[in-house]
Amino acid sequence: MQFRLTLLLLFALQSIVTAAGQPTWKAGSATTLITPEKPLWMAGYGGRTKPAEGIVHPLWIKVLALEDANGEKGIILSSDTLGIPKTIYDNTCAALKEKFGLERRQIMLHASHTHCGPVLRGALLDIYPLDEEQTARIEKYSTKLESNIVATVSKALENLEPAKVFSGQGISRFGVNRRNNMENEVPKLRAAGKLRGPVDHSVPVLIVRDMENKLKTLVFGYACHNTTLSFYNWCG
């Protein structure tokens, strides 16, 4: 059975530029590939019985750096991981402060919450039968992830340039309240217009264009628990 999910973005975009056309923002973005090179256990399902076996989509870190007219900087980071454990968050924020002078109020570290990413140091270690080799691999990967985050932020800051920043909000209706609707009943309930429970179908959007209006970066969010895929392949 093939499902088609139509994402309808109704952009009523508001430009955050001066009336005279002078840029009030600088923006820079960067990405880093973080797909594990060796098999690791996957985070997100307690019923898994073995490490990952292959790749569907690579895993990435993606960073947007913004600077306003007063020189105040902010970092938005997305990682293809289930979450960012406190140890990694703390170490990363400390490194970003030491290297770039960034305070925590200037840093947004976000995980896509994919259930097809690796187990990380400080999270879910007690629900998988990890041997010494796997534990060591997780530690090594987590340490490298920290350095990759810092390096990607560095690249994004180096790429800062005058930019136009737009904000807007769209809508996508594929999300369903899992607590109030049985999975096997969802197609029938949707067709009848009888899906139950609160949902948030809004899609907040941030668009960055250069001064020639070329699209540079797109940031969006959606409230949906990523539990659809349960195979043993990395998938960002």
Short names for language-model regions:
Residues M1-L5:
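Positively charged n-region of N-terminal signal peptides that target proteins for export
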